């Protein structure tokens, strides 16, 4: 493709859309990041940055965080809601709450909080869904507005800790997920001498569409039905505690792709709010939960990997629906709260790693079959003759199907002993030559070619063996078929020479990236420039800042990767800071209750028994270094 341009590369990987301007491709074909979105012209080349890290002793794979992107995302959400409030003359304010379950890393939480430090009135709170998260939030929330929302199932200890948080000066909302929690809250509040701030999570009839739609709807794991809501109201009235009910919460599910679903959910929850107010409650906060999506594939569509709306439209819909409803039912307008963790964190982190090798299916030169060869082999040779000639476009489809059918029959005859190994190998090579020729001859402009083109792209894709664990670093790609953008970090100024699939280094056939962003869609292979041992390039996995670290598992005992924080200083210089070493072999052994110290003693016994005395020290040193080493590959040249 001699007329390949950088614009072609940008379109091929759709980077301008899924990255929202945070990542891009430079004119020399290098992937860049704008680490401080307030200075978009200040870009960093990820390829050179990764190489510099390696030179400084940080082994790949490495997860790189850009905290200034977190700041920008927080402020963008707050600004969108503030503008919507002004536009619709909404008579209250907005609070952004970060649910730390999305990414509990201290660096991430602290940077999110730091984005609001300079604000006269911070618009940021924190959410916890478990006792460990609550303990973290109680210590960290003082750096924000001190608003804490407690979700999830709760026992007595969780509830007491939340109430103690109120005594520590925080505004702690205990959201009731089930009826039994109310009694415990009231008992413990009385014992501690605290007036609780209560919230209700209502279970809406409406259910948004998406991978996480089970979070909402009538069969949701969480929340109270309409009848249970009335029971709570009556119980609070009997205890003369109705004033404590300050927050209404609902959750449609994470990654809601369709703005109509959001609008409909807010409308139904708004009716709950108005009815509660009519019953005498004094609800002050309307918490819409999560749902603000990330456009992972950049298609701006209703697919589960995308969203058909922007941030401004999201805020406008929520504010306008609530404004109209409160006016219609003559109720005061509550403070709006959203818990938009995925949107805040996804873009800020990228995994950078190396390719340890490739396997390409290249056809070999073939000779025609012997005259006395089975007719089946002559049929396959005829397919090759036809496809290498000037077959018309429709004939190409027939040739493909005939050749695949013949190859299937070859395999069957081989299995029953009627064809030998050499004949099978010859047939497979002919089929490969036919497929390669067809791949170059077919065109996606012909609708009837497209299914076969997709098959050929998969069949002929190169295998890239990449130094990472899918299960540790991209667990959602394996578990729920989530799409994450993948790109080579350099060489994009040259036309792709092949298509490839990315395979991790675990001993599991599931360790394969099955879906790739390409153009305005999702493909099963990725276009890539030429890769050789002499001119290798690195691979980047993008938008991995939400959920992936905490959900990652240790399949094959591949542990946490190295990580680093990269910041742009006031002079536009790149600062690599807060480098955290990933797990060592000893670390991951300890996670599964294997004792590296006792292993070392065993090694010493074995070395003394089996190794010559002059070799023992070196062997023991290598074994000890093995326990201290990185779990990923470090020397594979």
From Swiss-Prot:
Co-factor(s): Mg(2+); pyridoxal 5'-phosphate
Chain positions found as N6-(pyridoxal phosphate)lysine: 101
Pathway assigned in UniProt: Amine and polyamine biosynthesis; agmatine biosynthesis; agmatine from L-arginine: step 1/1
Entry EC number(s): 4.1.1.19
Keyword terms, alphabetized: Decarboxylase, Lyase, Magnesium, Metal-binding, Polyamine biosynthesis, Pyridoxal phosphate, Spermidine biosynthesis
Gene Ontology BP annotations: arginine catabolic process; putrescine biosynthetic process from arginine; spermidine biosynthetic process
Keyword Cell inner membrane on entry: no
InterPro entries on file: Ala_racemase/Decarboxylase_C, Arg_decarb_HB, Arg_decarbox_C, Arg_decrbxlase, De-COase2_N, Orn/DAP/Arg_de-COase, PLP-binding_barrel
Keyword Repressor tagged: no
Database matches in CDD domains: PLPDE_III_ADC
Pfam families noted in UniProt: Arg_decarb_HB, Arg_decarbox_C, Orn_Arg_deC_N
Molecular-function GO term, any one: metal ion binding
Annotated positions binding substrate: 286-296
Catalytic activity annotation: L-arginine + H(+) = agmatine + CO2
Enzyme class: lyase
Lineage top rank: taxon: Bacteria
Function: Catalyzes the biosynthesis of agmatine from arginine.
PANTHER family on file: ARGININE DECARBOXYLASE, BIOSYNTHETIC ARGININE DECARBOXYLASE
Assigned protein family: Belongs to the Orn/Lys/Arg decarboxylase class-II family. SpeA subfamily.
Record-given protein name: Biosynthetic arginine decarboxylase
Species annotation: Shewanella pealeana (strain ATCC 700345 / ANG-SQ1)
Taxonomic lineage: Bacteria, Pseudomonadati, Pseudomonadota, Gammaproteobacteria, Alteromonadales
């Amino acid at each position: 493709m001699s007329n390949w341009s950088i614009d072609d590369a940008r379109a091929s990987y759709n980077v301008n859309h899924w990255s929202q301007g945070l990542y891009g491709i430079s004119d020399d074909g290098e992937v860049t990041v704008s680490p401080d979105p307030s200075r978009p012209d200040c870009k960093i080349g990820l390829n050179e940055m990764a190489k510099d890290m390696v030179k400084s002793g940080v082994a790949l794979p490495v997860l790189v965080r850009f905290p200034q992107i977190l700041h920008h995302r927080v402020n963008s959400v707050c600004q969108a809601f503030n503008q919507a409030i002004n536009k619709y003359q909404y008579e209250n304010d907005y609070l952004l709450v970060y649910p730390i379950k999305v990414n509990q890393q201290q660096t991430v939480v602290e940077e999110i909080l730091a984005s609001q430090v300079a604000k006269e009135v911070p618009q940021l709170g924190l959410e916890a869904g478990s006792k460990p998260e609550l303990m973290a939030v109680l210590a960290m929330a003082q750096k924000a507005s001190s608003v804490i929302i407690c979700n999830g199932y709760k026992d007595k200890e969780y509830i007491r800790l939340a109430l103690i948080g109120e005594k520590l000066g925080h505004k702690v909302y205990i959201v009731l997920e089930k009826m039994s929690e109310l009694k415990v809250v009231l008992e413990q509040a009385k014992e501690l001498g605290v007036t609780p701030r209560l919230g209700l999570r209502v279970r809406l009839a409406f259910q948004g569409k998406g991978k996480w739609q089970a979070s909402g709807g009538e069969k949701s794991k969480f929340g109270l039905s309409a009848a249970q809501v009335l029971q709570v109201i009556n119980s609070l009235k009997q205890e003369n505690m109705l004033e404590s009910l300050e927050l209404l919460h609902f959750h449609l599910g994470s990654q809601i792709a369709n703005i109509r679903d959001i609008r409909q959910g807010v409308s139904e929850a708004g009716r709950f709010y108005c009815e509660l107010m009519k019953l005498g409650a004094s609800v002050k906060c309307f918490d819409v939960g999560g749902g603000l999506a990330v456009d992972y594939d950049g298609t701006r569509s209703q697919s589960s990997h995308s969203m058909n709306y922007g941030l401004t439209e999201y805020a406008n819909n929520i504010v306008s629906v609530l404004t109209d409803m409160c006016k219609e039912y003559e109720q005061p307008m509550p403070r709006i709260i959203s818990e938009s963790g995925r949107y805040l964190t996804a873009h800020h982190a990228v995994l950078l790693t190396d390719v340890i090798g490739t396997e390409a299916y290249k056809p070999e030169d073939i000779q025609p079959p012997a005259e006395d060869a089975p007719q089946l082999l002559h049929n396959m040779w005829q397919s090759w003759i036809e496809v290498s000639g000037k077959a018309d476009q429709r004939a190409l489809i027939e040739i493909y199907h005939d050749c695949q059918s013949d190859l299937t029959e070859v395999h069957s005859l081989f299995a029953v002993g009627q064809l030998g190994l050499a004949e099978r190998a010859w047939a497979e090579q002919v089929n490969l030559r036919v497929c390669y020729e067809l791949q170059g001859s077919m065109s996606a402009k012909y609708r009837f070619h497209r299914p076969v083109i997709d098959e050929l792209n998969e069949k002929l894709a190169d295998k890239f063996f990449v130094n990472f664990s899918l299960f540790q670093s991209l667990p959602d790609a394996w578990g729920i078929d989530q799409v994450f953008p993948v790109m080579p970090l350099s060489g994009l100024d040259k036309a792709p020479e092949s298509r490839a699939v990315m395979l991790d280094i675990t001993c599991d056939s599931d360790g394969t990236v099955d879906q790739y962003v390409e153009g305005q869609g999702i493909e099963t292979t990725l276009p890539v420039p030429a890769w050789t041992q002499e001119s290798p390039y690195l691979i980047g996995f993008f938008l991995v800042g939400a959920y992936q670290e905490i959900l990652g598992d240790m399949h094959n005992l591949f542990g946490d990767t190295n990580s680093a924080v990269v910041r742009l200083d006031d002079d536009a210089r790149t600062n690599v800071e807060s480098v955290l070493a990933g797990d060592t072999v000893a670390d991951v052994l300890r996670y599964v209750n294997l004792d590296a110290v006792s292993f070392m003693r065993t090694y010493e016994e074995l070395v003394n028994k089996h190794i010559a005395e002059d070799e023992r020290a070196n062997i023991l040193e290598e074994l000890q270094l093995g326990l201290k080493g990185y779990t990923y590959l470090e020397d594979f040249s």
